[in-house]
Amino acid sequence: MGNKRIKAMMILVVMIMMVFSWRICEADSLRRYSSSSRPQRFFKVRRPNPRNHHHQNQGFNGDDYPPESFSGFLPKTLPIPHSAPSRKHNVYGLQRTNSRSSYFWTHAHLS
């Protein structure tokens, strides 16, 4: 009786895999023959330009990444400033209180 159950489970798994693979093929054929507003190839490979193989940029064309490539989908942002603190941040010390330790820390970094 256990042997029949194993066979039934194997048949069920095979049928599920067949249906799943059929759906993938069907979706691929629909994608291939449908019209879309964007190209289907998102990731573009940088191909070396054989005429410029001796240059410093390793011969890659600047037009290998047209605006419709994957990098065109990313939002444009402002450049990120350096993470090091500026002089303006270092001018302000701790506020002076009545204790001696706070007086030391307030004036120690200004020297």
Curated annotation (Swiss-Prot):
> So what does this one do?
May be involved in floral abscission.
Question: What cellular component GO annotations does this protein have?
Answer: extracellular region
Cellular compartment(s): Secreted, Extracellular space
More info: IDL5 is only partially redundant with IDA.
Give the protein name, as stated in the record: Protein IDA-LIKE 5
Tissue pattern of expression reads: Expressed mainly in flowers. Lower levels in buds and seedlings. Detected in vascular tissues and in hydathodes.
Q: Name one GO biological process term.
A: floral organ abscission
The answer to whether the entry has keyword Secreted is yes
Keyword list, A-Z? Secreted, Signal
Instruction: List every stretch annotated Disordered.
Output: 46-65
Signal sequence, start to end? 1-27
In which organism is this protein found?
A: Arabidopsis thaliana (Mouse-ear cress)
Regions of compositional bias (Basic residues) in chain numbering = 46-56
